[in-house]
Amino acid sequence: MNKIYEDNSFTIGNTPLVRLNNIGNGNILAKIESRNPSFSVKCRIGANMIWDAEKKGRLNKNIEIIEATSGNTGIALAYVAAARNYSLTLIMPDSMSIERRKLLKSLGAHLILTNGKHGMKGAISKANEIVSLNTKRYLLLKQFENPANPEIHQKTTGPEIWKDTKGNIDILISGVGTGGTITGITKYIKIKEGKKDLISVAVEPLESPVITQFLSGKKIKPGLHKIQGIGAGFIPKNLDLSLIDRIITVSSEEAIFNAKKIMKKEGILSGISSGAAIAAALKIQKENDFKNKNIVVILPSSGERYLSTELFSRSFKNENNY
């Protein structure tokens, strides 16, 4: 690659799309987002939210960035903040992996932990509380509603997938954390490229199916789960439900099992939310209408970020169930 980048924030994107040969029927294509500079899909939004704040004059060296995160967005913001010389404070539920805490600190971020039982809502509440004490000192990026989040996927991830598949994509599968990934990619393919028949599938935890509850008119009852990075427990503003065609729920155990499976059978190091996306792909591929369709699955992060979790600490007795 004959190019010198201005700083590491500009190295996002152009991640590989890899055919799975040992899982599914050969029509599942995995978008490996761990090939981004801080090894997750969140690198894209971490860079773009900071670039956007700079362009709009909301960020300078006297302002400290603050954000609530489940880990990967925080790591992405931390690497960009380090590369562009900004101070950063992150608020994260203490239920997230030890690896995430260590990475954040190593990248120079100040880390505040909140009670894990309150989930992302608790972290967001704490971030808002801190900013309210000094609105001139802090910039809260608000990843769940910041339009720079889906924008970067509409500008980069969507076009990359379209180019690599030559437009031959029938189904997109993505877990929902902030909703930015699936919204941005789907908007690009359905609206910009005009492929209205794309089936966009959102994945959420079975234990916390708030999107499913919302769409069925039921009371939203978030629950605890182990799929770090998706299932925030509320409907994020960046999730455009008008673009989504299907919701598939995946249990924490299914997600962990399939993350192990893709590592062992395909040689792709994958995190738990990647396992959830693969589980959803295998479910939809079993349906007669979709068994021969081209499926693109977003794999958000790599396995090393989960060494202290159940992804690496136990095996399953009921593997045949999946």
UniProtKB/Swiss-Prot annotation:
Q: What's an example Gene Ontology biological process for this entry?
A: cysteine biosynthetic process from serine
Q: Which CDD domains match?
A: CBS_like
PTM N6-(pyridoxal phosphate)lysine: at which residues?
42
Binding-site residues for hydrogen sulfide, renumbered to this chain: 8, 35, 269
> Has keyword Protease?
no
Instruction: Report the PANTHER family cross-referenced here.
Output: CYSTATHIONINE BETA-SYNTHASE (PTHR10314)
Q: Relate the assembly described in the record.
A: Homodimer.
What is the designated name of this protein?
Cysteine synthase
